[in-house]
Swiss-Prot record:
GO terms for molecular function: rRNA binding; structural constituent of ribosome. One of the primary rRNA binding proteins, it binds directly to 16S rRNA where it nucleates assembly of the body of the 30S subunit. With S5 and S12 plays an important role in translational accuracy. This is Small ribosomal subunit protein uS4. NCBIfam families: PRK05327.1, rpsD_bact. The gene is rpsD. SMART domains: Ribosomal_S4, S4. It comes from Amoebophilus asiaticus (strain 5a2). Part of the 30S ribosomal subunit. Contacts protein S5. The interaction surface between S4 and S5 is involved in control of translational fidelity.
Length: 200
């Protein structure tokens, strides 16, 4: 299955949540797309579990294999599996670039990383799924810093909305200060439903 690049509004309406940010389409039509979208049937527990997994995959832009690998990695580690899964998702390089305010969306963050605009601890990293650790420094290449289009876009965004990240606007670098706690992750994801789905 390829990564979804279709209409964002359609996905937001499917989950009845602004998956990719504020959605005017969702405000106008807060029901699923399709001929029978307005008819809301009571979902089974399994359907809810699938929906929560699908929502998380769309939010973070992962394919099934990538998502499953992160889940099993979290399941093997000591701790609360659902929270560990969210931590793995949050500390992906593309997500941190987005959280720092370097880009307006995760999709554009993924492109910035893939096109070798981002550094980690001074070295170029072009793998969006790169797992960051506490203490890692995220920055822009010198060539990217000289691009007015990118630097103006960065300066127009508000930064440091996340307690677990730090942003230095003068040096244009960010730092992972700690792993995010569940209450610091704003997305409305029922991670326990995902755990139950994979545990069957």
């Amino acid at each position: 299955m390829a990564r979804y690049i279709g209409p964002k509004a359609k996905i937001s309406r499917r989950f009845n949540e602004p998956i990719f940010g504020p959605s005017k389409a969702l405000q106008k039509k807060n029901y699923p797309p399709g001929q029978h979208g307005k008819i809301r049937k009571k979902k089974s527990e399994y359907a809810i579990q699938l929906m929560e997994k699908g929502k998380a995959k769309y939010i973070y832009g992962l394919l099934e294999k990538q998502f499953a690998n992160l889940f099993y990695k979290a399941a093997k580690k000591k701790g609360v599996t659902g929270e560990l899964l969210l931590q793995y998702l949050e500390t992906r390089l593309d997500n941190v670039v987005y959280r720092l305010g370097i880009t307006p969306t995760r999709r554009s963050a993924r492109q910035l990383v893939s096109h070798k605009h981002i550094t980690v601890n001074g070295k170029i990293v072009n793998i969006p799924s790169y797992a960051l650790k506490v203490g890692d420094i995220i920055g822009l290449t010198e060539k990217t810093k000289s691009s007015n289009a990118i630097t103006e876009r960065i300066s127009s965004h508000s930064h440091n909305k996340n307690n677990w990240l730090e942003w230095d606007s003068k040096q244009m670098i960010g730092k992972v200060m700690s792993l995010p706690h569940r209450e610091e992750i704003p997305e409305k994801i029922n991670e326990q439903s995902i755990v139950e789905l994979y545990s069957k």
